[in-house]
């Protein structure tokens, strides 16, 4: 029997910082996170909505040079790469009658996109206040036809709100209303890139029902189930019979490999993901210190900017059957307590379903 935890560091502000963890074991058999889940949500309840898919699974786009901040271009391109590497969706700059116009709206700090393929020359606004690839994926998934996770019909099983939604202004009601037409495709994952953060100081944000997931909400990491719901909706599949381990499935972008839950790797998800290390749990505590250095990206004018995506370190902790592994995060060097742990942190995989996001920690307050 093996357990593992994933060390995450976003390539934005955590440069070469240390995280110190202690690993141990005790003689107790314990089953964690055995709850059953309903399937995920998507707007697709009528013939009208079905026409909002992109033809031939290809999204055409162009950058509107008169009003686009090219410092965020890398974020969008990386987001497209992430989606196309895990699904059958392709992004093309070939001219098309129906395409997305990429702009940067300087009048707002918000980024936004229209839901699904809705018209010619439709809008996708992305500016420097958004910047990261994770936020760009969020908006691109809207463009593919998906609503927020917290607008699912089953969201009240996982979230609660401080105020009745009808007390909010119209803008926020639109962001939190449950859409009439939905199809549940994958389990609810509060770590979805489509889930808004848990902001306890903001009256209109959702609050998690389970305290351990507080810093998981608002993630900038694309969840396993985010890719799977795209593949299901766009009917992406592989003709071969590749056998995938550990709940993986054949990757429609490369049918010789599997899409694996975070922490698993190799062509068939039978190995530990790389880079990483494997430890053997013992009856006494072991100290482990991990350092990740994200580095920077440089523009042509030598302007130095944070990176747009995460780097990862995957640790497997091996233990005999009928043993429970104990993990204690001792400290973060300059860790930041931010919703979604968007500047880096640790995810300790505790869910029985390894495809679901587990609790994330990013500072002493959460560890």
Curated annotation (Swiss-Prot):
Q: Which residues bind Zn(2+)?
A: 138, 142, 148
- Give the UniProt subcellular location, in the record's own words: Secreted
Catalytic residues, chain numbering: 139
The chain positions of domain EGF-like read: 232-270
How and how many cofactors are bound, per the record note? Binds 1 zinc ion per subunit.
Cofactor(s) needed by this chain: Zn(2+)
Span of domain Peptidase M12A: 41-237
Domain of life, per UniProt, equals: Eukaryota
| Residues that carry a glycan | 56, 85, 169, 241, 254, 287, 322
**Purpose of the protein:** Metalloprotease.
Q: What is this protein called?
A: Zinc metalloproteinase nas-22
What species is given as this protein's source?
Caenorhabditis elegans
Taxonomic lineage of this organism? Answer: Eukaryota, Metazoa, Ecdysozoa, Nematoda, Chromadorea
